[in-house]
Amino acid sequence: MIPAASDNRYINRELSWLAFNHRVLQEAEREDNPLVERVRFLGIFSDNMDEFFRVRVANLQRALLVDEESTTTLGFGVRDTLTAVSARVLELQKQYNAAYDTVWQAMREANIRILNESEYSEAQCAFASNYFKHRIRTHLV
């Protein structure tokens, strides 16, 4: 359900933003994109969703706390917008999970592995510790 506005010439800002992020996700799904680009698109999608919730959804929730019948500047109902956003985000998250699994499988097939620290050998642990101490920590404030 797309929230109704007083003037239907306008598109709901939040749903439009989610449509843009859907296009980012579609780039991650495209098998003709290089694998490293597909990983980047997954990261961009994830970062965008984090910001969307921190800013857009939080603002809608605050508006709803102030006035349960509040509307946006263009007349979209805040409650209806939140309902529509929740439904769309659920769809996008399912699609993201499938894309993530597909990209990670493609990485394994390309012999690219991302290890967490519990999978490191002793030599890898020593290398990572030494690298951090001498190359990274010196640049941290």
Q: Residues of each region from the PLM?
A:
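N-terminal localization/anchoring segments of enzymes in phospholipid and broader phosphate metabolism
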Residues: 1-141
